[in-house]
From Swiss-Prot:
Xref: Pfam families: CobS
Catalytic activity: alpha-ribazole + adenosylcob(III)inamide-GDP = adenosylcob(III)alamin + GMP + H(+); alpha-ribazole 5'-phosphate + adenosylcob(III)inamide-GDP = adenosylcob(III)alamin 5'-phosphate + GMP + H(+)
UniProt-listed Enzyme Commission number(s): 2.7.8.26
Protein name: Adenosylcobinamide-GDP ribazoletransferase
Parts of the chain that traverse the membrane: 24-44, 46-66, 96-116, 117-137, 158-178, 181-198, 209-229
The organism of origin for this protein: Thermococcus gammatolerans (strain DSM 15229 / JCM 11827 / EJ3)
Length: 233
């Protein structure tokens, strides 16, 4: 798992670039690490803890996936053929669609957290990391970037191990609080992002995978918030 840290977090450790694509199965294991600081903020109930928790999360994960979300949204929303959409996604300038997507994801997370228990971000991050694994498992790369490199290492064994690990980390929480299962709604959002990416671009690159991660997390928090509000104990 150590080799994943430099590529998916800001945690200052060295990783082996040659080995990382063979350890993608461990992506769900990153969730306890990436959500730890944010979960602590929520547990301590600090003033503006919902905002501080999201800032703590991005302090840990970095903004690379959020940047990918902006690029992805620009590409999806532009009118035209596939070539034009890919060109818009790769444009260094962020358009209004990208700005809107980033703001909406940020606000959905910030305003969902006050309605949820302190461990909600852990569940959202767990689903986010698993959704990234599912995106890589499509093995339909767009271009020859880092996403394509990771996809080359994906296989059935890694997906099976990753799924087992995901369930191992999810089910104990769901046993204690059954409503935690509602976090899986985030996976539906992530699956829709994968579908949109394949339809608009014909494959997935790092920007698409970043969008999957961000939208899955926001979708998980939103889904849980709805369930907690309407099915609260």
């Amino acid at each position: 798992m150590r080799n994943l840290l430099p590529f998916f977090t800001r945690i200052p450790v060295k990783g082996d670039f040659e080995r990382v694509r063979n350890e993608l199965w461990a992506l769900p294991l990153l969730a306890p690490l990436t959500s730890a600081l944010a979960t602590l903020v929520l547990y301590l109930e600090l003033p503006l803890s919902n905002v501080l928790a999201i800032l703590a999360l991005y302090f840990t994960t970095g903004l690379l996936h959020l940047d990918g979300l902006a690029d992805w949204a620009d590409g999806v929303m532009v009118k035209g053929d596939r070539e034009r959409k890919i060109k818009a996604m790769k444009d260094l300038n962020t358009g209004i669609a990208g700005v809107f997507a980033v703001v909406m994801v940020f606000l959905l997370q910030v305003y969902s957290l006050p309605l949820l228990p302190f461990y909600a971000l852990y569940l959202a991050e767990l689903n986010s990391k698993f959704a990234m694994l599912l995106a890589l498992a499509t093995r339909k790369p767009l271009g020859q970037g880092l996403g394509a490199y990771f996809m080359e290492g994906m296989n059935g064994r890694q997906l099976t191990l990753g799924t087992a690990l995901y369930l191992l980390l999810l089910l104990p929480v769901a046993y204690i609080e059954p409503r935690s299962i509602s976090s899986l709604l985030g996976l539906l959002a992530g699956a829709y992002v994968i579908r949109l990416s394949l339809r608009n671009f014909g494959g997935l690159n790092g920007d698409c995978i970043g969008a999957v991660a961000e939208i899955t997390r926001a979708g998980a928090l939103l889904g849980m918030a709805v369930v907690w509000v309407y099915f609260g104990g």
